[in-house]
Amino acid sequence: RGKIAQSMGYRVKEFFHKYFYEAAYPLKKYSRNIFWESMTQNTEKVKNLSKNFAINSQHQIIPDKNPVTLFSQNPIRIFRIFAWVSEKNYYLSYPIIRSIEDHVDQMCPIFINKDDQKEVQLCFKRVINGKYFSKSLRLLHEFGLLANFYIPEFKNICGLLQDIYVHHFPTDIHVLSALDILNGLEIDEDTDPFLRNLYHSIRDKTTLKLSVLLHDIGKGIRSPGQNEELLGARLVPEILQHLGY
């Protein structure tokens, strides 16, 4: 890895960020979109979620109206989708994916009034409280909403390389992977029975989930010699307030 980075004129950390976030990650999205463009979309609804969204036979969320105008008229609707994913383990249909990608730039706090801001915060709480929270948080991260809207401090840990002898992933992916493991204690019956029972013995799991989500947030602003845990602890109160806690 180091030799490849050096041959291309980068240090390892710079190379990884350039390669993964500006090449590999976008390639994944474009490849997915090309694949879906070649498929016939399942538009037959089997269940209504709201007056604007429904579910098809593949458990995908589909628009019940023109997706082009659906989000352009009310971008807040995007956040409800991730709440449904977390609560019911639904999937995103291709029209929904493209519509989110086309309108994600409208997802900026300065464009949202106070009443809508409260609804957006409620949607995040529904994501955290949902049974499939890690899946939904990954999607929020993939579309850029986790860092660009909910937790701006998350930008600083995106692609941030860590000690390769302990961590296999950059910091943001490491956090999401940790959330996957935590979520597995809730939905996977084959996980360690002791840990599973310990997890289910916790009455309110919100604090635990948020702790895992934010446990490395201090790494993004750390300078040499600084304690990342203390830095993160100072950031957390303001982050939680922004999230509506």
What are these regions (language model features)?
Residues 51-61, 142-159, 170-212, 217-218, ...:
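Active-site-adjacent "gating/activation" loops or surface patches in catalytic cores
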Residues 72-75, 172, 226:
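Alpha-solenoid helical-repeat scaffolds
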Residues 1-32, 170, 195-245:
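Divalent metal-dependent catalytic cores for phosphoryl transfer on phosphate-bearing substrates
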